[in-house]
């Protein structure tokens, strides 16, 4: 009998599973991502996308809650996303989060 090889999961899939079970860890990951990668917005956007997915939020759900069009949210959270501060703030609000400012160390 042949054994079924286990499918390897991507890093993102593993994180998504873990964050689904522990939303506080997801928020800590997102905060850390922003603090450590403020000069690499694509990494921060990827983290926001990952956390929103782990919370079960679709693009359409985020758009509705953020009072934005789905295409705006899709572009904002896409691989080349560059959301406005207003859109970013609205997306974070749908996840129960807000932007804050801290003094750089």
Placement of each model-derived feature along the sequence:
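Structural motif corresponding to alpha-helix initiation and N-cap regions
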Residues: 13, 82-85
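Short glycine-/small-residue-rich flexible loop motifs, especially phosphate/cofactor-binding loops
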Residues: 49, 60, 89
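Short alpha-helical DNA-recognition segment
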Residues: 54-75
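Residues that mark the N-terminal boundary/hinge immediately upstream of a DNA-recognition element
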Residues: 58, 84-87
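Residue-level detection of the helix-turn-helix DNA-binding "recognition helix"
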Residues: 78-79
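DNA major-groove recognition helix of helix-turn-helix/homeodomain DNA-binding modules
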Residues: 86-102
């Amino acid at each position: 009998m042949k054994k079924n090889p286990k499918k390897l999961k991507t890093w993102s899939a593993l994180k998504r599973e873990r964050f689904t079970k522990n939303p506080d860890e997801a928020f800590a990951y997102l905060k850390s991502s922003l603090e450590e990668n403020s000069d690499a917005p694509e990494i921060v956007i990827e983290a926001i996308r990952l956390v929103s997915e782990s919370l079960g939020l679709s693009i359409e759900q985020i758009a509705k809650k953020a009072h934005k069009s789905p295409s705006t949210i899709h572009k904002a959270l896409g691989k080349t996303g560059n959301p406005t501060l207003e859109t970013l703030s609205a997306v974070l609000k749908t996840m129960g989060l807000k932007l804050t400012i801290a003094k750089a160390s």
